[in-house]
């Protein structure tokens, strides 16, 4: 199942200015595939809105708890507040509309 994770942080916790957070991002990036796999998840895509201090990650996983556990193990909870949304593709949504 697909989950869109929305991650927000304050400007003072931004990897662009906080060296400790930047180091965490570099470690997370290097270990992401392995950590996600340990929770039965895979990375499907990611987007960053630098000025809004928002990150969006699309994760395929067995359930929201696995996605949340992976986010914690990746260290994302250290500087972000996360919201996890179950999502489907637009084609799936349109295909599910009543005739």
Residue ranges and their predicted role:
Residues 55-57:
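A generic structural motif
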Residues 1-44, 48-53, 62-66, 88-99:
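Short S/T/G/P-rich N-terminal loop/turn motif that feeds into the first structured element of a domain
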Residues 60-92:
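An amphipathic, aromatic/His-enriched active-site/gating alpha helix that lines ligand/cofactor pockets
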């Amino acid at each position: 199942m697909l989950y869109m994770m929305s991650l927000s942080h304050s400007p003072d916790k931004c990897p662009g200015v906080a060296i400790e957070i930047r180091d965490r991002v570099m470690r997370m990036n290097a270990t992401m595939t392995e950590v996600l796999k340990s929770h039965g998840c895979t990375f499907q895509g990611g987007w960053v809105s630098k000025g809004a201090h928002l990150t969006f990650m699309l994760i395929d996983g067995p359930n929201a708890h696995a996605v949340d556990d992976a986010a914690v193990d990746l260290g994302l909870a250290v500087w972000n507040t996360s919201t996890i949304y179950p999502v489907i593709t637009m084609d799936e949504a349109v295909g599910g509309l009543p005739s």
